[in-house]
Amino acid sequence: MEPREAGQHAGAADGAQEDVAFNLVILSLTEGLGLGGLLGNGAVLWLLSSNVYRNPFAIYLLDVACADLIFLGCHMVAIIPDLLQGRLDFPGFVQTSLATLRFFCYIVGLSLLVAVSVEQCLAALFPAWYSCRRPRHLTTCVCALTWACCLLLHLLLSGACTQFFGEPSRHLCRTLWLVAAVLLAVLCCTMCGASLMLLLQVERGPQRPPPRGFPTLILLAVLLFLFCGLPFGIYWLSRNLLWHIPHYFYHFSFLTAAVYCAAKPVVYFCLGSAQGRRLPLRLVLQRALGDEAELGAVRETSRRGLVDIAA
């Protein structure tokens, strides 16, 4: 081998080693963020399901936390073979199950975020109509319908693109993934439109302090999705529709997806925290949800208790 060719081979080997090291760093960060996200979403799920007063928007966040929890669990398990550099490999049906379950939870979380954005926008634009005419069980029905529709799409994709229910159909599989791509685009546009209208309504509202709680939470969650959650959806659709994407986008989208799911509980607790005061997590989450009436009742009860003790 000539010296020039030897140098080229050595340079290629060094570049490959650097790529492997970089990918390992990204995957390790993804695992760490996923673990933090599991703890954060687990805390949100526990607080919303047991201790915190359930306003309509709390039910949305309860379902979002559940979807994120399942997504992160599958996400962390799915990247273990890449992290261990081929020393461990899952059977094909396990890899397929993890992949389809991740996309299912991703679409559920996005659909719920769209639903809560639209409902918060309606509450800001038409407060009188919303408070008087809103169906009592609207949130529960929307959440149940979202899970059911996403499950139907999940089963159709599994039946057409995998061997779970028989021989896969390439034509039907590609058609369903195109439907999923259109669905993702429609959901993103609807969410952005509702969030923009909500932002304009908050800015143009009467002369009063802007709401620190739930509207701000929704706007931050939407921004978080656009910058961190959307790359995973783009990667997943491109992969299944056989569109060309850069190789580095694979690990990048996995990292940003972990950031997206792990950062949402941080946003909840940061928005609900009181500057200069340490509050229980239950009250912090209530403040983020805008349960001012419930918080007032809690404070009044606390004051009465102190008075009774003093007496």
Swiss-Prot record:
Keyword list (alphabetical) reads: Cell membrane, G-protein coupled receptor, Membrane, Receptor, Transducer, Transmembrane, Transmembrane helix
User: In this record, what's one Pfam family?
Assistant: 7tm_1
Q: What is this protein called?
A: Mas-related G-protein coupled receptor member E
Write down the membrane topology: Multi-pass membrane protein
Spell out the subcellular localization from the entry: Cell membrane
- Ranges in the Extracellular compartment? 1-25, 85-95, 158-177, 238-251
GO terms for cellular component = plasma membrane
What the protein does comes down to:
Orphan receptor. May regulate nociceptor function and/or development, including the sensation or modulation of pain.
The UniProt entry's coiled-coil ranges are none
Matching entries from InterPro entries are given as: GPCR_Rhodpsn, GPCR_Rhodpsn_7TM, MRGPCRE, MRGPCRFAMILY
Under PANTHER family, the record lists: MAS-RELATED G-PROTEIN COUPLED RECEPTOR, MAS-RELATED G-PROTEIN COUPLED RECEPTOR MEMBER E
Superkingdom of origin organism: Eukaryota
Q: Which family does the record claim for this protein?
A: Belongs to the G-protein coupled receptor 1 family. Mas subfamily.
* Topological domain spans for side Cytoplasmic: 47-63, 117-136, 199-216, 273-311
> Is Oxidoreductase one of the keywords?
no
